[in-house]
């Protein structure tokens, strides 16, 4: 039954491993439940309503993918697209949040249509094999960089762009987490990343990093979504500018999702010899449905999360991993004060170790052929330097086409 519903094979998979993987995936991406409401609230949206919408949309999309695609790739609101929503569409271009949310709803509907017509699948399967491996490694570098930046280990510098940050309780806790995660992994402790997060959260209490508020109660009643539910506004919708906005949202989501799916599929070993990803259409459809329903609730665009790699690193291989993750998103509605105690610094070790795990795919890139190695390198480094998986992919693909054409290998450009 579990094999048919979730792809869980008891003969080759362990239920305990899948459960730990699901918990680990949730813990490493649960920050979105705190960050997404904070970002969208800058537009005037009700923070409590957005929190509820974020948790429900994440649970819905993740559970859909669990049962439809049977893969351990969790989904939640995109950090790139929620920033685009708040800081570009609303604060930059002057649209109301209702109009901007309408654009995301329409984008989600278009997503469903082009996924049904296999357009996104064609895009995914047209990516050259060496670039797929480079995307996986690049995402690993990106994840590690995000963890180091959020912990203050890497900070901005006007002269060199980035530099090693000062020693603070947050950065020290993050460094401890990196070492602890590495040691636990080397000792082959099952659930190493999960235990690292829990231990660092406890260590953070005396350091003042894990903050326990006065009158703390671990359980709360979910906030109503009434202030954001289906609050659409089509008054400013039928314009050329809005058409460009929708196209941009579509483009960003396609490449974010495609890049992440390729990287995670490479890491799990499910990618077939010809580079095809099993159940990719179902994975993309759950993304599209999640985006559409999420925008109706009051959440920004849904995408596949690179943090799923943390659960994969713990051994998650089936939809059962996502069943656990999805249920935890639902429980988070009632235990929001409890899981919000986990500081981002406590997850840094997991993110860095995941980056290490994903880097092994670079060994599969043909580095002796510069026409393959250069686009692969551009893909990886630009993901980090532009702070965007999508930008890294686009630049890598562009480099691939131009280099192949330039050296007379036009037949290799599909």
What does each model-identified segment do?
Residues 61-74, 183-188, 249-256, 287-297, ...:
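Transmembrane alpha-helix interface/packing and boundary motifs in multi-pass membrane proteins
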Residues 1-49, 162-163, 195-281:
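Helix-loop-helix hairpins and the membrane-proximal interhelical loops
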Residues 47-48, 73, 97, 389:
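Membrane-helix interface/capping residues of multi-pass secondary transporters
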Residues 93-206, 210, 323-414:
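Membrane-embedded alpha-helical modules
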Residues 19, 39, 123, 191, ...:
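Residue-level signature of catalytic and energy-coupling elements of molecular machines
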Residues 2-36, 57-58, 78-87, 91-136, ...:
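Helix-loop-helix junctions within the multi-pass membrane cores of secondary transporters/permeases
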Residues 44-63:
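Loop-to-helix transition at the N-terminal end of transmembrane alpha-helices
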């Amino acid at each position: 039954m579990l094999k048919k519903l979730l792809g869980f094979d008891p003969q080759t998979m362990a239920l305990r491993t899948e459960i730990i993987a699901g918990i680990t995936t949730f813990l490493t991406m649960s920050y979105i439940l705190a960050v997404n409401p904070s970002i969208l609230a800058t537009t005037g949206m009700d923070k409590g309503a957005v929190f509820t919408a974020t948790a429900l949309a994440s649970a819905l999309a993740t559970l859909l993918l669990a049962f439809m695609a049977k893969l351990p790739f969790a989904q939640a609101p995109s950090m790139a697209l929620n920033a685009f929503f708040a800081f570009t569409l609303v604060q930059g271009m002057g649209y109301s949040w209702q109009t901007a949310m309408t654009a995301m709803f329409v984008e989600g509907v278009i997503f469903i249509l082009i996924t049904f017509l296999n357009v996104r699948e064609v895009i995914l399967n047209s990516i050259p094999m060496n670039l797929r491996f480079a995307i996986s490694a690049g995402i690993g570098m990106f994840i590690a960089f995000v963890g180091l930046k959020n912990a203050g280990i890497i900070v901005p510098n006007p002269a060199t762009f980035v530099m090693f940050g000062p020693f603070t309780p947050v950065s020290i806790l993050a460094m401890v987490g990196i070492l602890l995660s590495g040691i636990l992994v080397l000792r082959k402790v099952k659930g190493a990343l999960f235990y690292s997060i829990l231990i660092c959260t406890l260590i953070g209490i005396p350091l003042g990093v894990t903050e326990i508020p006065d009158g703390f109660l671990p359980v709360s009643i979910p906030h109503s979504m009434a202030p954001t539910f289906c609050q659409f506004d089509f008054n400013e919708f039928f314009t050329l500018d809005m058409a460009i906005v929708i196209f941009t949202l579509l483009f960003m989501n396609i490449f974010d999702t495609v890049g992440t799916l390729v990287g995670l599929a490479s890491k799990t070993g499910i990618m077939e010899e010809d580079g095809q990803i099993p159940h990719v259409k179902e994975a993309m459809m759950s993304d599209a449905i999640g985006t559409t329903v999420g925008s109706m609730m009051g959440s920004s665009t849904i995408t596949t999360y690179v943090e799923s790699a943390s659960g994969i690193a713990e051994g998650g291989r089936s939809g059962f991993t996502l069943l656990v993750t999805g249920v935890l998103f639902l429980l988070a509605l009632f235990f929001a004060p409890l899981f919000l105690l986990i500081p981002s610094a406590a997850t840094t070790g997991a993110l860095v170790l995941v980056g290490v795990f994903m880097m092994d795919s670079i060994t599969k890139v043909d580095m002796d052929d510069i026409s393959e190695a250069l686009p692969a390198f551009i893909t990886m480094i630009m993901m980090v330097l532009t702070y965007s998986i999508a930008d890294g992919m686009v630049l890598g693909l562009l480099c691939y086409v131009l280099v192949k054409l330039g050296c007379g290998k036009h037949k290799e450009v599909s």
